[in-house]
Amino acid sequence: MIKLYLVRHGETMDNAAQIMQGQTPGRLNDVGIQQAEEVARKMASAHIDVFVSSDLYRSMQTCAIIARPHLEAEMHLKGTADASAFLTEDDILQRIETTSLIRERDWGDFTGKFIPSLPKDPKDWPDNVETLERMKSRAQNFLTWLKVAYPDKTILAVGHGIINKAIQSVYYKRQMNQIEKMANAEVRVLIL
């Protein structure tokens, strides 16, 4: 049995400005950093074997903030004095497994555009927007990869709003529009 803590990255500058980020790296704003720090505090005593993140920077940044207390505690147990002084973000990122399977949806020509100005009807979307079927395929591949790579482990994975909906859609065998949107830095638990 795998316990998966599925997390959405913290708020970014583009989230706050309602800009479609898609598969751009992104960077947390001050609110996003505070959100990730709050998750880190709440999850500090939880047992986590593996930290996984989308390979987009906003998720990696969120995951690094959440992982820090765990990695510092691990170093302290190994006898490293004042572990926090030695852990840079790069040190932490080296301990996080990254994957493109949980990248955000590829929004094609919509990437970088102001979200309220975009057409709502998918029939009016450009052909280069990633389909829901393709996203659900990536989501299924992600869940399969976790089962093979990390059986019987507790995993914290940081992804994005829509790919996290796709993961839950596959997991619960429900349509994506039946899955509630995750807030920035929200955590949901799935048992695989």
What residues fall within each predicted segment?
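Short active-site segment of divalent metal-dependent hydrolases/proteases
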Residues: T12, I163-N164
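Glycine-rich phosphate-binding loop signature in dinucleotide/nucleotide-binding domains
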Residues: S45-H47, L146-K153
